[in-house]
Amino acid sequence: MKRRIKIGEIKMGKKKDKTKERYKNLTLLHSNDLHGDFLAEKINKDLVGGVSMLSGYINKVRNEEQNVIYAISGDMFRGSVIDSEYKGISTIEIMNLLGPDVATIGNHEVDYGIAHLLFIEKCATFPIINANMYIATNGNRLFRPYKIIKINGMKIMFIGLITEMVLARTKLESMIGPFIDINDAVEEVGKVCNAYKPDDVDLTVLLTHIGFEEDRVLASKLKPEWGINMIIGGHTHTFLDEPEVVNGIPIVQAGIGTSQIGRFDLIIDTKKIK
């Protein structure tokens, strides 16, 4: 029986087989709102999606391209009986096998409680980042705010952000909830970016879970000197055939589940995307 996965690809620029040392190719794959979508769905006579097909495509790209990064923009949890039964532990083990290079949290990552989420974060073999979730009493972040991935001499920085909707869920936790706060996303991006000189990183990506319209608002408020190159979003399950550009910043989402994946094919020239 044939198995296939619908792959939605977003490409920027043309790939070149040979590039000078100044120019380097980078393939950036991204998913969001997987929601425990592990199994393929039968459509007509074909099986579409499923984590095994998604993994197969990612591995295929890793074998074909020299520099590949795979990022997940929140809501890995919820949506399946298996995920609910094991409260995300089974899901994070499957995500470990899928092998993302970086992920941020979504609102459904807190469905099983903040303490449980912190345990899940320790179970992950990949970095889970968030810059704007804080402990209200001492001002400490709950997660590392960013991750710089070094690949073939390039430094790619990801900054994680989450929607304020998560507060509605955390406030239900009588013991921990009142001590959790969500800071302004723009302010947190500025804090991270101001800590780096422009030459410190080659590409800066916001990995958000705040929704497409909020991504547009966020992009409009970002200062040019912060050097944000793109926003990879989630939360609203938005399908985009082409990036939405606001304030010179491309914004993308890859819908929902495992039946599609976003893809950027980039040529990096120090600070510029060609």
Segments and roles (model prediction):
Residues K2-K274:
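Acidic, metal/ion-coordinating pockets
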